[in-house]
């Protein structure tokens, strides 16, 4: 005689439903755990970069102070006869020298004092930048005569100057006007710009400016265009970095992670300054990242859920109800 099953019609169905729900919860927890690890990894990388950026700014703060002393030191002046000056335009002059990686350009009148100043700055920056294989530039706006001096390591500067005008020379007047405007800001002696990109060489840099006031003359401004390619961690994209002033509402110096619209924004204060480093990640990028790194896990879980559904429906239809199907 057939013995009636002790299982009620919906018991086994509910067991498999609970099993499927458990698989879904496990999948969601795994994805959330990866998301948390992703956020922590990005924040740790940003913290590391902000620390290195703070050291870099401190270094250039010292270099700027030392450069200002060199520019105003009249005791050690190189011989003007040794300077070879090439006129690029009526107001742009290139100083050729023995330096292999540094170029000096004077914007303004071809005066001996300006050429000597450019030579001294180039010789000093050769020591600072000579061993670095990266893009860096320095603009020195002399408060005595409003002369602008450019010292740069740009690798293609000489060919551009010989055959066509460089973007560095074309933007000189804009640089001068910008530096003159910022020199009138009495409440700000130090200014850091947002991160910019030079697309032809895929270079990311920011501008660091320091103002120096001396009695009897206009403000002298030293401006560095500093490359950060060597500071960017491998798991971060330079296109998504920004530098802005620290909000007044931020009372602590701790890093923060916040959602603004569909963007996840990581932030970390730059020690020794009133600025903050930000990194933006879009929701779309996070979704693709999470799915891409968990594709096989999700595939396996979905296959298990699919087979569990098939078995649950088969048992409910064939083995539980009606009992006559079991004969």
Show the residue positions of the predicted features.
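Solvent-exposed, extracytoplasmic
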Residues: 120-131, 203-204, 208-251
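Extracytoplasmic/periplasmic ligand-binding sensor regions of membrane-associated signaling proteins
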Residues: 138-221
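Extracellular/periplasmic juxtamembrane segments that couple receptor/chemosensory ectodomains to their
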Residues: 226-230, 239, 246-301
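Cytoplasm-proximal transmembrane signaling helix
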Residues: 282-327
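Juxtamembrane extracytoplasmic/periplasmic/luminal helical "stalk" adjacent to the first N-terminal
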Residues: 19-107
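Short N-terminal helix-loop-first-beta-strand/juxtamembrane motif that initiates sensory/input modules
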Residues: 61-97, 127-148, 233-255
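Extreme N-terminal signal-anchor transmembrane helix of membrane signaling/transducer proteins, especially
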Residues: 2-40, 299, 306-309
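Well-ordered, non-membrane alpha-helical segments in soluble/globular domains
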Residues: 114-125, 296
């Amino acid at each position: 005689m057939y013995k009636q099953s002790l299982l009620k019609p919906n018991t086994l169905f509910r067991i498999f439903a609970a099993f499927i729900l458990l698989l879904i919860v496990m999948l969601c927890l795994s994805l959330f755990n990866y998301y948390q690890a992703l956020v922590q990894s990005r924040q740790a990388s940003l913290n590391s970069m902000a620390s290195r950026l703070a050291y870099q700014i401190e270094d250039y703060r010292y270099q700027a102070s030392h450069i200002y002393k060199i520019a105003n030191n009249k005791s050690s002046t190189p011989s003007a006869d040794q300077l070879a000056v090439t006129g690029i335009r009526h107001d742009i002059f290139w100083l050729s020298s023995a330096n292999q990686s540094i170029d000096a350009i004077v914007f303004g009148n071809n005066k001996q004092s300006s050429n000597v100043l450019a030579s001294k700055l180039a010789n000093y920056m050769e020591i600072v930048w000579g061993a670095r294989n990266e893009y860096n530039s320095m603009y020195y706006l002399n408060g005595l005569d409003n002369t602008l001096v450019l010292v740069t390591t740009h690798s293609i500067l000489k060919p551009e100057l010989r055959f066509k005008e460089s973007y560095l020379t074309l933007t000189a007047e804009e640089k001068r006007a910008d530096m003159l405007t910022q020199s009138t800001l009495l409440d700000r002696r130090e200014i850091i710009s947002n991160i910019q990109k030079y697309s032809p060489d895929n270079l990311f840099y920011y501008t660091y400016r320091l103002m120096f006031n001396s009695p009897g003359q206009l403000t002298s401004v030293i401006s560095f265009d500093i490359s950060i390619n060597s500071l960017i961690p491998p798991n971060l994209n330079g296109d998504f970095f920004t530098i802005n002033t620290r909000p007044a509402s931020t009372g602590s110096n701790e890093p923060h992670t916040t959602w603004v619209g569909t963007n996840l924004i990581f932030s970390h204060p730059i020690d020794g300054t009133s600025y903050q480093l930000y990194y933006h990640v879009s929701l779309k990028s996070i979704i693709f990242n999470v799915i891409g790194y968990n594709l096989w896990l999700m595939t396996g879980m979905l296959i298990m859920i699919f087979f569990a559904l098939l078995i649950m429906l088969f048992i409910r239809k064939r083995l539980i109800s009606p009992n006559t199907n079991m004969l």
